[in-house]
């Protein structure tokens, strides 16, 4: 059971701003370790807080990927990504 990866416009813009090597690492991580697994939550961590309950984060080096996992659609929506100092602001 493979999950589909979709990116918001904001996430695509942030991905394009990264250097090519870092962007490739992030995309490879999402393809191989998140979307290909039966349960994408196994390699991530849930964000805490009243409004963040449905969002998950993944760590790739100094970068963080914020996702919304939609079980009914087998879809992982990448909402935001960036350096760990900036992504949570």
Task: Identify the residue ranges that each predicted region occupies.
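Basic, Lys/Arg-enriched alpha-helical interface segments
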Residues: 1-57, 62, 71-76, 86-89
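Residues forming the ATP-binding cleft of Hanks-type serine/threonine protein kinase domains
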Residues: 82
């Amino acid at each position: 059971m493979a999950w589909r990866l979709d990116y918001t416009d904001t996430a695509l813009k942030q991905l394009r701003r990264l250097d090519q090597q870092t962007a490739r690492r992030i995309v490879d991580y999402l393809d191989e370790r998140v979307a290909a697994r039966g349960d994408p939550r196994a390699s991530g961590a849930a964000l805490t807080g009243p409004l963040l309950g449905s969002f998950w984060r993944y760590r790739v080096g100094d970068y963080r990927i914020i996702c919304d996992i939609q079980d009914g659609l087998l879809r992982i929506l990448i909402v935001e990504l960036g350096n760990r100092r900036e992504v949570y602001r």
